[in-house]
Amino acid sequence: MSLGIRYLALLPLFVITACQQPVNYNPPATQVAQVQPAIVNNSWIEISRSALDFNVKKVQSLLGKQSSLCAVLKGDAYGHDLSLVAPIMIENNVKCIGVTNNQELKEVRDLGFKGRLMRVRNATEQEMAQATNYNVEELIGDLDMAKRLDAIAKQQNKVIPIHLALNSGGMSRNGLEVDNKSGLEKAKQISQLANLKVVGIMSHYPEEDANKVREDLARFKQQSQQVLEVMGLERNNVTLHMANTFATITVPESWLDMVRVGGIFYGDTIASTDYKRVMTFKSNIASINYYPKGNTVGYDRTYTLKRDSVLANIPVGYADGYRRVFSNAGHALIAGQRVPVLGKTSMNTVIVDITSLNNIKPGDEVVFFGKQGNSEITAEEIEDISGALFTEMSILWGATNQRVLVD
């Protein structure tokens, strides 16, 4: 009787369990993820892997074992895309990378760089507090800033490596003025901050003149020696560095312990023609139209056709970094031939005259900077028309166009 009662007590559980069992259960079909097609862009920047790799190796060969290399990749690698450039530096065993903002610090570390990571400008207190996560060597040029960084380091129980910037080059930007007792005393106090470690002393050249470089170098050598003495630091324990791209190529004695170079990696230097350009700015023809002599072109009718003309519509404008200064002044390359920009550059459109060309069709490649066939739009041409440094333009183009690694 008791056994029957026990089974009756379990009956509700059997019923519930049975009700929970699937009937004619069919497992869901495996969902196959659809591959999304790549977005087709109206314009893009090609970054030549082979040219970049060539330039890096050439700099390394130039320096040999006489000095170390810090690759400056600030400004999103001068507009060339840090995420594309940094891995090539890592592949070439570059030991030091210089950047500016915390996003760049994070990106370089996330890409797997394990070497020295240096900030090459003064940082805000908020930046410095966060940057301790990335094991960065901060640039310090005044006592107050050093004290604030020391407090951050103490709060986080860390010792932060720093590079003391001197104003030896006369930039009057980041550096500590040490040509007087007050400046030397500040340098001494910086060295005594318990949570900072001086690992480098640096300065910067404000102009590209070999004789001026030598003058500034002599001043830096003298001042850095004085600073080392008041700080009580061993010379072999501190990296001295001042050379930029121009100084590195033209004044070898400026190399010291390390050089900081950036533009040279992209072929952007007046000091040598031995380095290759890395960037090409491209688009395609959207449409072709025929217009009679006397028609005007673009906003404000700034150009009047002098003949019956064939005009190509290129989907690039100042929204893509092709500024209005190129209106009626710039050129593009189509089929290896130079063609003039007519009228004012619109936000999203440029018109070029292809009347003299044959067999041109929509979809054909257009180059606004770089080489196509035997023709080239040079950096000097871009600078002459725009009134801007080419670096300004490359950073602008990089910020407004997709960058793709080629060859």
From Swiss-Prot:
Lipid-modified residues of type N-palmitoyl cysteine are 19
Bilayer-crossing regions: none
Q: How does activity depend on pH?
A: Optimum pH is 8.0-9.0.
List the catalytic activities from the record: L-lysine = D-lysine; L-arginine = D-arginine
Residues annotated as binding substrate: 173, 347
Which residues, renumbered to this chain, carry the PTM N6-(pyridoxal phosphate)lysine? 74
**Pfam families in the cross-refs:** Ala_racemase_C, Ala_racemase_N
A Gene Ontology cellular-component term? periplasmic space
Q: What is its EC number?
A: 5.1.1.5
Give the way it sits in the membrane.
Lipid-anchor
Q: Which family does it belong to?
A: Belongs to the alanine racemase family. Bsr subfamily.
Name under which the protein is recorded: Lysine racemase
Q: Which taxonomic lineage does the organism of this UniProt entry have?
A: Bacteria, Pseudomonadati, Pseudomonadota, Gammaproteobacteria, Enterobacterales
Q: Which gene encodes it?
A: lyr
